[in-house]
């Protein structure tokens, strides 16, 4: 999609993307619409909700529908900045120092439970989210374009967590909740699961952003 696209064409493409994602994600249309708007605006989204509400599935579905490379990182207390950004290591065979990219070098990064990692690692994302680059050992490395972060956290669990600082929260264009499905939506989800059997749901690419 480009800025020059006709509004009607852009709207139709957006609806097609949401419809395709809706084949595997039941309900949550309003939340999906907000996430898509954030993606088109090249922003980042923070989803604050309980586990098991489909956050990972939503992120994977958006990546597939939009033709984006997807990477998931589970944020844990022992996660280091180098585990996220990458590091410079010495290659014995070539006799040179080489930079090995971390999982942040992707199009759509799912930061799962971002509030479970210490502030030092949280801060490692600041430059990446704001400037789409990372600086390591005095060298700046550009990230792939587009670069989008979809982060999640559990807002009701505080033990073993580190609240996101204001500087980090400021990098997100939106904060939203997914909330539970309605009774009718839960019934639809169960029927789809029974009809599908053990076959995993798939999302087809609709457009290349």
For each of these PLM feature ranges, what is it?
Residues 65-93:
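AAA+/P-loop NTPase substrate/partner-engagement loops
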Residues 50, 84, 152:
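P-loop (Walker A) phosphate-binding loop of NTP-binding proteins
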Residues 34-37, 90-111:
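Conserved alpha-helical scaffold flanking the Walker A/P-loop in AAA+ ATPase domains
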Residues 39-76:
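Walker A/P-loop
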Residues 45, 109, 147:
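Conserved beta-strand position immediately N-terminal to the Walker
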């Amino acid at each position: 999609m480009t800025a020059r696209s006709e509004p009607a064409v852009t709207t139709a493409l957006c609806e097609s993307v949401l419809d395709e994602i809706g084949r595997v994600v039941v309900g949550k249309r309003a939340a999906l619409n907000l996430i898509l708007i954030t993606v088109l605006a090249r922003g980042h989204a923070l989803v604050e909700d309980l586990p098991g509400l489909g956050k990972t599935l939503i992120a994977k579905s958006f990546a597939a529908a939009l033709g984006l490379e997807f990477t998931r990182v589970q944020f844990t207390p022992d996660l280091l900045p180098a585990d996220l950004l990458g590091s410079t290591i010495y290659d014995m065979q070539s006799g040179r120092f080489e930079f090995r990219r971390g999982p942040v070098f992707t199009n759509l990064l799912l930061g799962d439970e971002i509030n479970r990692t210490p502030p030092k690692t949280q801060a490692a994302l600041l430059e990446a989210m704001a400037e789409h680059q990372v600086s390591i050992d005095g060298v700046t490395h550009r990230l792939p374009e587009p670069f989008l972060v979809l982060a999640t956290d559990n807002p009701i669990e505080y033990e073993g967590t580190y609240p996101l600082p204001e500087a980090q929260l400021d990098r997100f264009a939106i904060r939203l909740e997914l909330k539970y499905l309605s009774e009718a939506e839960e019934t639809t989800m169960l029927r789809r699961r029974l009809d599908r059997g053990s076959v995993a749901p798939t999302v087809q690419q609709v457009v290349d952003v």
